[in-house]
Amino acid sequence: MTLKELRRNAHNRLKEQPNISSPELDADLIIMFVLDLKKDELLTKDISVPDALAIEVNAYLNRRLAGMPVQYIVGKTEFMSLDFIVNKNVLIPRQDTEILVETVIERYKNVSEQIRILDIGSGSGCVGISMARYLPNSVVTELDISEEALKVAVLNAEKNLVTKQMNFVCRDIRDGISDLEPKFDVIVSNPPYIKTDDLLELQQEVIEYEPVAALDGGDDGLDFYRIIIKKAVPKKGGMTAFEVGIGQAGDVAGLMFKAGYRNIEIIPDLGGIERVVLGYAA
């Protein structure tokens, strides 16, 4: 079988599943993974594919057809134009979250002193590691309750050449950060914000494969905003920035104002959805 034939067959197989939103892209990612090809090689080469590799491709296609996210199948994804390792212990980074990173970078890119950043609920490390890459004078602490998630973040720091800028802390944020000194210039978080009752309405592949603890924000979706605002305060004049779910920006801004934050901003994403809430500690 030639590479072109393999691609055509793979595309057609995934197109049969209506719940797969990007069948051709997913099929190509699997083929590139199995055959160890780059994108340009996939598009320009028409090599003969050994039967064993074609069988392996079909085995991974079966996993995708069963609902496994393609990012978990190939073990990686792209975020902020960087490559990140992902597995079942971490949420798959979403493009929606890039505006959170971009917002912090934009506000601190001209700061010449060291910038101390705390990323709460770091998961794969995509948020904090991206900031470390694009803010070379930053020192980033990744905090997560999951040891397995932090192991992935450590690998991603190595992969993206920022290990020397990183610290890793395994902790429940409910225990606070008072022992982490000096205080942080920036606290950033993309916390669990889905209402508990709404979890079952998520896509099958999210419910069955991604870690629910990283999604469940309690009855009103705001539990972790309350906890973080209470337990993790940046230094005076420092910034806290959150990603928020649809319709939550006003509530989170209100929580921050009550806690003493000032100059609070709500920032929409490219689709006009209020996606980031930030404020400065008084």
Which residue ranges define each predicted feature?
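Helix-to-beta-strand junctions that scaffold the AdoMet/dcAdoMet cofactor pocket
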Residues: V162, E210, V233-G237
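Active-site beta-alpha loop architecture of Rossmann-like, nucleotide-cofactor-dependent enzymes
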Residues: Q71, I194-D197, G247
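Non-catalytic accessory regions of SAM-dependent methyltransferases
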Residues: M1-D40, I47-V49
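Conserved hydrophobic residues forming the short capping helix/wall of the S-adenosyl-L-methionine
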Residues: L14, Y108, A157, A232, ...
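Conserved Class I SAM-dependent methyltransferase catalytic core
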Residues: D219-Y280
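Conserved SAM/SAH cofactor-binding pocket of Class I
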Residues: D96-E201, R226
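Mobile active-site "lid"/loop adjacent to the S-adenosyl-L-methionine
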Residues: Y193-D223
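Conserved AdoMet
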Residues: I31-R107
